A protein has these predicted regions:
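RNase H-like DDE/DDD metal-dependent nuclease/strand-transfer catalytic core used by mobile genetic elements
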Residues: 1-93, 97
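C-terminal, beta-rich DNA-binding module of retroviral/retroelements integrases
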Residues: 99-207
Length: 207
């Protein structure tokens, strides 16, 4: 995943954020996956980053980011440069001016660079997953299934290769958890997961 290598570079240089707010599109979310998770979102969760989704069709909930994109497009792509090298020069000039030179009204006429502090959370790769309060720890297959007692329970391909905890809560009924998040339940007869309440669903956000 190209975007993963880009984020790894950013996390090594600037540290890990507490949370990342995004819309519900690719690669941040997957409409057809369990709870809208994507492989990128799963990786963020593994790193201890909270995922915060805006409500669909409400870009104003991420207004600062949307405005930055408008300013970026206006300054660098209207009109675009004649070639890739010239376009990159325009991007770098924009970054210098936007972050280090131009004062912003929203931050008392200071520059973003004057206020920015890197995260103190150091990127160290993925921590090991453990489920001491579950009956079993199983690894989701790359095709998105739990293999249990010769049965194959479909969960989600975005969790392929990840360890999950399963706990029997009733006769033939098992709860599935990923990290501290309860994903849903499956029974041994249907071999299909029934999603629980979405722990990553959009909610009312403030800027």
């Amino acid at each position: 995943m190209l975007f993963r290598s880009v984020f790894e570079h950013l996390f090594r240089e600037y540290g890990l954020p507490k949370r990342i707010r995004s819309d519900n599109g690719i690669p941040f979310a997957s409409a057809h996956a369990l709870h809208g998770l994507s492989r990128l979102a799963v990786w963020w969760l593994r790193l201890g980053i909270e995922i915060e989704r805006i409500k669909p069709g409400n870009p104003q909930q991420n207004g600062r980011h949307e405005r930055m994109h408008r300013v970026l497009k206006q300054a660098t792509a209207r009109p675009p440069a004649g070639n890739m090298l010239q376009q990159q020069d325009k991007f770098e000039s924009f970054i210098q001016e936007y972050n280090y030179e131009r004062p912003h009204e929203g931050i008392q006429m200071k520059t973003p660079a004057a206020l920015y502090e890197p995260s103190k959370r150091i990127y160290k790769g993925l921590p090991e997953l453990q489920y001491p309060f579950h009956d079993r720890t199983v690894v989701i297959t790359e095709c998105g299934r739990i293999c249990l007692d010769r049965r194959k329970i479909s969960v989600s391909t975005v969790l392929g290769g990840q360890k999950v905890g399963i706990k029997q809560v009733d006769d033939q009924i098992w709860q599935v958890s990923f990290m501290q998040y309860d994903l849903g339940y499956f029974d041994m007869d249907s071999c299909r997961i029934e999603p629980g309440p979405n722990p990553f669903g959009p909610r009312l956000l403030t800027m």
